[in-house]
Amino acid sequence: MEKTYNPQSIEQTLYQTWEEKGYFKPHGDTSKEAYSIMIPPPNVTGSLHMGHAFQDTIMDTLIRAERMKGKNTLWQVGTDHAGIATQMVVERKIAAEEGKTKHDYGRDAFIDKIWEWKNESGGTITKQLRRLGASVDWDRERFTMDDGLSAATQEVFVRLYEEDLIYRGKRLVNWDPKLHTAISDLEVENKDKKGFMWHFRYPLANGVKTADGKDYIVVATTRPETMLGDTGVAVNPEDPRYKDLIGKEILLPIVNRLIPIVGDEHADMEKGTGCVKITPAHDFNDYEVGKRNQLPMINILTFNADIRESAEVFTTNGEVSDVYSTEIPAKYQGMERFEARKTIVAEFEELGLLEEIKDHDLTVPYGDRGGVVIEPMLTDQWYVRTAPLAEPAVKAVEDGQIQFVPKQYENMYFAWMRDVQDWCISRQLWWGHRIPAWYDNDGKVYVGRTEEEVREKNNLAPVVVLRQDDDVLDTWFSSALWTFGTQGWPENTDALKTFHPSEVLVSGFDIIFFWVARMIMMTMHFVKDEEGNAQVPFKTVYMTGLIRDENGDKMSKSKGNVLDPIDMIDGIDLESLVEKRCGNMMQPQLAKKIEKNTRKTFENGIEPYGTDALRFTLAAMASTGRDINWDMKRLEGYRNFCNKLWNASRYVLMNTEEHDCGMSLSAEERANMEFSLADKWIESQFELAAKEFNAHLDNYRLDMAANTLYEFIWNQFCDWYLELTKPVLWKGTEAQQQATRYMLITVLEKTLRLAHPVLPYITESIWQSVKPLVDGVEGDTIMTQALPQFNEENFNADVVADLEWVKAFITSIRNLRAEYDIAPSKGLEVMIKVADEKDAARIEANKVVLSSLAKLDEIKVLANGEETPACATSLVGKSELMIPMAGLIDKDAELARLAGEVKKTQGEIKRIEGKLGNEGFVAKAPEAVIAKEREKLEGYQETLVKLEAQQETIAAL
């Protein structure tokens, strides 16, 4: 082994070997249990971020552990075509490089351009996945627009259409006026803005008056421009001010349209004026009110979100209607929406109908990619009827076929699924799965897998011209088929039979509706087991939190706080990090602030920590469902942990290579080896660690599994066991040394196997050196060795109790040395009043170890009632440990030192008490700051008690 641990020199070579040798593939023995995980497919346009690194570490740890248990494991990998994101990247690229738009290319040529770009640049994220050590089967890599998944997507669409679960309808969608497409709720970013609430007077028609004699009612709106499309005013049916007006009419200003007053609970008596203008074609709530009250829908906006030259009028079912005029006043025609807003407010003021304007805090929806305000827009789109699909999907979770970890996410799932809305699946893009629907010249629609199939099925003559629908499917539609589409469905393939359903889905809670719920619905509808029962896509949904920065803020390019996992693996200098964070910004004005913060936080850039340290940090922070505040100090700590494991392994190898470790002994001879108490203890401790580690993984508590490894390797194996072996290896008999060498190398080998799922690289690298020294190890890689399980035969509770007593004895001596400032190297005489024969036997059996590790010249067991000089004392269990102090310390100097410490500590206590007694400080300081001060105070108070006790002891000497 190299003297120092250098992850850069081992990681990529090892990964290449693993991949070339095919270790990531399922072993194919179908008599063994199968275990599969389907990776959430990252966007093909993307690069690895901390969220990916976090989830991929969790998945790889689970898959490596199950592979080591002998299961037939598949970690299915692939990428998503990411419709809107990919199309925008390529549109920006051709605009910057060629000054062209997609229309200059035309649809087919532009799509070819995207494929070309995908083949050139689409591999970034898969290269980065390899850097993380992801043991996915690369030979089975899939892409959501490859031939197989495209065929599966088409098949699902056609079948759902034939079952009347897909329809085309005119409904309200989130419309991006810049990108000219419908977008999902996930692509809408709601921003808090300061705005206004305009109060308009709407005149009552036909001489009607309100209860207090007014000939108008007042409506409040934040979007005056939409009043051109109003088709009603809603009041609460219980509102005494207006209930008599229900059924009466308003003469809508500017357009002079008669619209009804309807009673609807959407109108809140306590909010605003209690009267709500209803624009069903331009507001989601109004759309529902309109449906309930049979109000027509008037669309006044173009796809650019300008005012139309003439309105479109529809019934609540989306059919063209002549119930209202389509006329729009000439001055508004073609006007930009926000310009129209100002003009309408001005006209209301001219008409004497502007009651008042109030400041108002608003939440405004923006398209997260187009960056403009989204409009609710009435458009023709394709929809999935989700209610019939949702029913079995809810039952699967209720019945425990699918479990959520943590369980509280089930409630979020139920809340959404029990109020599920039809799903808009069409997008006005070019890149994606084109909808398999064709229209003839009369507008009649035909759905089929191909145009040939459509013609054949409907007996259409060659002269009948068919035009395919221009829209593509929502990316989430094909993603919903991921668990079964990747395994060869609609064919009943061996892969589908073996690896479906998958074991666990690791996902963020933010896509529980967009992806998780839809996968459950689609899979249960299309995939059946041999008995014809619906299959679930996965048995467990493991919900992770978000990875935030050290201050708890979400990582984003605009905040300049994004950390690239690869930079933590390889390191990055400060100037490159600044350039990375400040270059190509959508909001360049933020660059200065971001540069300042980056230089302050990372004065020397980021060191290379290696993949294993990053993985261990992510695992150690993975408490289920909670957001994680990233902490570079923990990353540094776990890099030190990797160093510790490396150095400990070198110590073991130096003491076992070219030595007799008893490997050639028979099982009977081995049972009679002269193992020390420490040897037997570390074997027992390892069994406990194996038991805990496996239990934590089974419960998806990777944080606790990582903690078990850390505790065992750092504290028990390195800090204690290796120290306890030194007296034996230096002074023991040949038989004792042979036994200790045997235990050193076998426990190290088992420890490497136990840690491998979390720390794949360092464990493989060390294991290759350890393997030749251990009897009975076959195979070329640690990846396919057995994951250690608890073996009761190797566990001895009495041994653990005895060694814990020995540790307590040594720790007590070390603490007394520190307390009384006695040099660690100074030999001491120790006396002990034993509580019972067991403790006396422990001393007798372990004198060599106790004397060696505690640096003792003599251990004297006192007889009952034996007089003792002035001593520093400590309890070990119920036995009393004493160090005679005469000649060990300068009493006067020590008392003077302690007096100084006491004075300093009292000063700190007084200062903090003054701070906490200051009402101004307590009122203004954040709760966390106050809590920290209280914690400091408690610490100083405890220190003072200890110092005063030491003063008493030394004064009595």
From Swiss-Prot:
PROSITE patterns: AA_TRNA_LIGASE_I
Residue intervals passing through the bilayer: none
Localization: Cytoplasm
Alphabetical list of CDD domains matching this protein: Anticodon_Ia_Val (cd07962), ValRS_core (cd00817)
Motif 'KMSKS' region, residue numbers: 554-558
UniProt key word Coiled coil: yes
Recorded catalytic activity of this chain's protein: tRNA(Val) + L-valine + ATP = L-valyl-tRNA(Val) + AMP + diphosphate
Residues forming coiled coils: 890-956
Superkingdom of the source species: Bacteria
Motif ('HIGH' region): 42-52
Keywords tagged on the record: Aminoacyl-tRNA synthetase, ATP-binding, Coiled coil, Cytoplasm, Ligase, Nucleotide-binding, Protein biosynthesis
Gene3D superfamilies: HUPs, Isoleucyl-tRNA Synthetase, Domain 1, Valyl-tRNA synthetase, C-terminal domain, Valyl/Leucyl/Isoleucyl-tRNA synthetase, editing domain
GO terms for biological process, alphabetical: valyl-tRNA aminoacylation
Family: Belongs to the class-I aminoacyl-tRNA synthetase family. ValS type 1 subfamily.
Family annotation (NCBIfam families): PRK05729.1, valS
Protein purpose: Catalyzes the attachment of valine to tRNA(Val). As ValRS can inadvertently accommodate and process structurally similar amino acids such as threonine, to avoid such errors, it has a 'posttransfer' editing activity that hydrolyzes mischarged Thr-tRNA(Val) in a tRNA-dependent manner.
Name of this chain's protein: Valine--tRNA ligase
Origin species: Aliivibrio fischeri (strain ATCC 700601 / ES114)
